[in-house]
């Protein structure tokens, strides 16, 4: 496994309730617990949960993405408790070639963190960072048809539905939202 950062990197964002930071070694078990929840993973990729080894592989991929692009997915930590809630951040959506080139904003939170506005709060911080610090001019976000909670977050961010298409590697119908920054 690619070595995860052991301490906070200069690349972190803060909101009223959340710390968005680079991944740490200690995050593996907490993130594996999120990825083991069927209701969380229902609309992710092919809908299957991930075990600890699969989660470790994903975290290594997230680290490689940061190294290659200079941005990526942040671990979302609840400031009040120090708990890992999930992630939010930016990625290059190579799994959907028809929309490339693009930068996608995405999120995944454990079930215990749903319905509290945390995904929107975290994503708003990432949008501001993408615009103000990274100089990006456009973001997309993609959700599997049926994931209305993610669609609501996209709309709250100011995104508009751009197209519906099929994700080639899974055959699932997805909706692509976009916004100019």
Where are these predicted regions, by residue range?
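Conserved GNAT-fold acetyl-CoA-binding loop/helix
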Residues: 39-61, 72-74
């Amino acid at each position: 496994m690619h070595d995860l950062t052991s301490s906070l990197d200069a690349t972190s964002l803060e909101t009223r309730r959340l710390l968005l930071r680079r991944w740490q070694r200690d995050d593996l078990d907490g993130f594996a617990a999120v990825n083991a929840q069927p209701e969380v993973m229902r609309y992710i990729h092919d809908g299957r949960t991930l075990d600890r080894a699969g989660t470790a592989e994903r975290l290594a991929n997230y680290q490689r993405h940061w190294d290659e692009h200079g941005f990526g997915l942040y671990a979302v930590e609840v400031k009040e408790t120090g708990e890992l809630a999930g992630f939010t951040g930016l990625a290059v959506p190579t799994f959907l070639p028809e929309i490339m080139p693009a930068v996608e904003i995405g999120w995944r939170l454990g079930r215990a963190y749903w319905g509290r506005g945390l995904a929107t709060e975290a994503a708003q911080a990432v949008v501001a960072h993408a615009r103000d610090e990274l100089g990006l001019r456009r973001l997309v976000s993609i959700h599997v048809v049926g994931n209305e909670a993610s669609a609501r977050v996209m709309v709250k961010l100011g995104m508009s539905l751009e197209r519906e298409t099929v994700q080639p590697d899974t055959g699932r119908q997805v909706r692509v939202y976009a916004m100019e920054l």
